């Protein structure tokens, strides 16, 4: 029998040898060396990919975990440096004040989440920090205690839009009384 390619010949031979192996008890399918010689290049490639795909996933997972850990440590270090730079200055810009307030809120929430601390030194340090914060907050001499109420950004956007409409900078689409449709009744729309 003639075959068009070695792959089809190999497939036919393996099918027949598997059939004989199921029927005849002493029949062997063939040597591994013969299989390697008779396999086409695509079959060899697919076999290699099947065998090496599982370890590649594990290796990729490990490398991604290492990269993530390095990135996390880099970001923590950058945040620490930024905090120390801001902390060393006497006067802070508005952005720096916002950043410091955000840090205070985050750290305060983390402290609140700790239910019980076993180490006595840490408890003493926390109580010292709390006391110093209360002292700093409590000393508001020569400062206003009340500030004027600020409108939220959402309300200010609406107010700005309404002011622009009133001044005529923005026109709102709609019907004017003279351009209403002829057969339009207000009672029909309700």
UniProtKB/Swiss-Prot annotation:
Disulfide pairings: none
Keywords carried by this UniProt record: Nucleus, Transcription, Transcription regulation
Coarse class of the protein's main subcellular location: nucleus
Pfam families registered for this protein in UniProt: RRT14 (PF17075)
InterPro entries: Rrt14
A GO cellular-component term linked to this record: nucleolus
Superkingdom as given in the UniProt entry: Eukaryota
Subcellular locations according to the entry: Nucleus, Nucleolus
Biological role stated in the UniProt entry: Involved in ribosome biogenesis, probably through modulation of rDNA transcription.
Family, as annotated: Belongs to the RRT14 family.
Protein name: Regulator of rDNA transcription 14
Native source organism of the sequence: Scheffersomyces stipitis (strain ATCC 58785 / CBS 6054 / NBRC 10063 / NRRL Y-11545)
Gene: RRT14
């Amino acid at each position: 029998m003639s075959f068009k390619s070695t792959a089809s010949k190999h497939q036919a031979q393996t099918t027949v040898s598997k059939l004989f192996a199921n029927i005849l008890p002493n029949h062997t399918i063939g040597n591994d060396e013969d299989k390697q010689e008779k396999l086409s290049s695509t079959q060899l490639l697919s076999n290699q990919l099947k065998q090496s795909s599982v370890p590649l996933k594990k290796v990729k997972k490990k490398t991604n975990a290492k990269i993530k850990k390095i990135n996390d440590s880099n970001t923590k270090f950058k945040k620490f440096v930024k905090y120390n730079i801001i902390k060393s200055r006497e006067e802070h810009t508005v952005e720096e004040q916002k950043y410091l307030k955000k840090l205070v809120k985050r750290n305060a929430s983390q402290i609140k989440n700790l239910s019980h601390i076993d180490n006595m030194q840490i408890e003493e340090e926390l109580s010292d920090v709390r006391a110093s914060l209360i002292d700093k907050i409590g000393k508001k001499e020569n400062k206003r205690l009340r500030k004027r109420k600020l409108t939220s950004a959402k309300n200010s956007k609406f107010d700005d839009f309404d002011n622009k409409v009133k001044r005529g900078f923005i026109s709102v689409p709609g019907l004017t009384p003279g351009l209403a449709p002829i057969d339009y009744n207000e009672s029909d729309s309700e």
